[in-house]
Amino acid sequence: MSLNRHMIREEAFQVLFALQSDSEADIQTVYEAIPHHDEKQIPPYLLTLVNGVREHQDQLDEQINDLLASGWTINRLAKPDLVILRLALFEIQYAENVPTVVAINEALELTKTFSSDKSRKFINGALGKFEKQVNENN
């Protein structure tokens, strides 16, 4: 079965989440450990997301810090929320043919699956704020 982009994003989330615990782990090994899929070959878009988020992580984290309310730091965020924000911000800025609204909607779908309703509202607000900043600068 071929994976669609939504499923690839879910698996990219899982790989990135696992790599937070062991940044030296091999992406292929982590990918193969994800349950519920028969694919052994990593989809190219998953590699784009995982490698892109890792490559730009410092910049993405700075941007996330800028989106937080005063008194909050990135260290206070739930780990799933942090991974979802990194993925969304990466897609908004670097992924080809992914409109901002799609990246935000996909982030909200990931939040429904991997986080909480409260987090969904937070992520929606943070990404909405980022989108507004981008639109104001263009």
Curated annotation (Swiss-Prot):
GO cellular component labels: cytosol
GO molecular function per UniProt: RNA binding
The keyword Lipid metabolism is assigned to this record: no
UniProt keyword annotation of RNA-binding present: yes
Family annotation (InterPro entries): NusB-like_sf, NusB_fam, NusB_RsmB_TIM44
Gene Ontology biological process terms from the UniProt entry: DNA-templated transcription termination; transcription antitermination
Keywords associated with the record: RNA-binding, Transcription, Transcription antitermination, Transcription regulation
Coiled coil segments of this chain: none
UniProt xrefs under Gene3D superfamilies: NusB-like
Source organism superkingdom: Bacteria
Family: Belongs to the NusB family.
Function: Involved in transcription antitermination. Required for transcription of ribosomal RNA (rRNA) genes. Binds specifically to the boxA antiterminator sequence of the ribosomal RNA (rrn) operons.
Protein known as: Transcription antitermination protein NusB
Origin species: Limosilactobacillus reuteri (strain DSM 20016) (Lactobacillus reuteri)
Species lineage: Bacteria, Bacillati, Bacillota, Bacilli, Lactobacillales
